[in-house]
Amino acid sequence: MKVRPSVKPICEKCKVIRRKGKVMVICENPKHKQKQG
């Protein structure tokens, strides 16, 4: 999980979602998981 000021999808399988007001990227590749914070 990477915490970044700006989250972007890295590959085609990355999905940008909102969870409890936070923007997150979820993906099949665990290295691509990101959280805004």
From Swiss-Prot:
What are the protein's UniProt keywords? Ribonucleoprotein, Ribosomal protein
The protein's assembly and partners: Part of the 50S ribosomal subunit.
Per the record, the similarity remark reads: Belongs to the bacterial ribosomal protein bL36 family.
Q: Which InterPro entries match?
A: Ribosomal_bL36, Ribosomal_bL36_sp
- What name appears for this protein in its UniProt entry? Large ribosomal subunit protein bL36
Could you tell me one molecular function GO term of this UniProt entry?
A: structural constituent of ribosome
User: Taxonomically, what lineage is the organism?
Assistant: Bacteria, Bacillati, Bacillota, Bacilli, Bacillales
Cellular component per GO?
Answer: cytoplasm; ribonucleoprotein complex; ribosome
